[in-house]
């Protein structure tokens, strides 16, 4: 499988380095880390998010598996609960395939942000703040791990500060 990327102009690119190039029968030289279009061999600047460059916002269903298992395995009854559905908006764009079929697409980053509960002004069941016990917030992790939400926030900010100062190194 090979993932498609888009640039700021909306042009689609098949980047070299996509995992599908790893198992080609005949080596094409496209299993590498160069950010180039595998078809045209031209470099491009990929768009990280469709937010602000989208055709529409769409609801995506995510599953919250928090209560589907027991964290105390010695007392587990072996019975589980169903996952809870969480609906969150993501920015999307419509593209046409070569056979004229229309597809609705988004970026992996936009899906990741929605899964993690980072609203970016989008609609849906996003956490209101760090104290909201929805999945992946400091309040949620405190209930799951016993680690204080304030400590989790502090550590997260220190990681971010270090990344900024070292430019990600």
Residue ranges: model-predicted function:
Residues 1-165:
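Long, well-ordered, tryptophan-enriched scaffold segments
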């Amino acid at each position: 499988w090979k993932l498609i990327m888009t640039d700021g102009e909306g042009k689609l690119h098949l980047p070299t380095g996509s995992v599908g190039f790893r198992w080609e029968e005949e080596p094409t030289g496209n299993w590498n880390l160069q950010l180039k279009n595998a078809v045209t061999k031209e470099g491009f600047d990929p768009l990280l998010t469709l937010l602000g460059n989208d055709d529409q916002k769409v609801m995506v269903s995510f599953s919250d598996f928090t209560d589907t298992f027991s964290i105390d395995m010695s007392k587990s009854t072996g019975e589980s609960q169903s996952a809870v559905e969480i609906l969150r908006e993501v920015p999307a764009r419509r593209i046409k395939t070569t056979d004229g079929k229309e597809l609705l697409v988004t970026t992996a980053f936009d899906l990741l942000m929605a899964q993690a509960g980072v609203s970016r002004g989008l609609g849906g069941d996003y956490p209101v703040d760090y104290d909201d016990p929805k999945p992946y917030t400091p309040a949620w992790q405190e209930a799951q791990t016993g680690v204080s939400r304030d400590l989790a926030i502090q550590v997260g900010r220190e990681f971010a500060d270090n990344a900024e100062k070292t430019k990600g190194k």
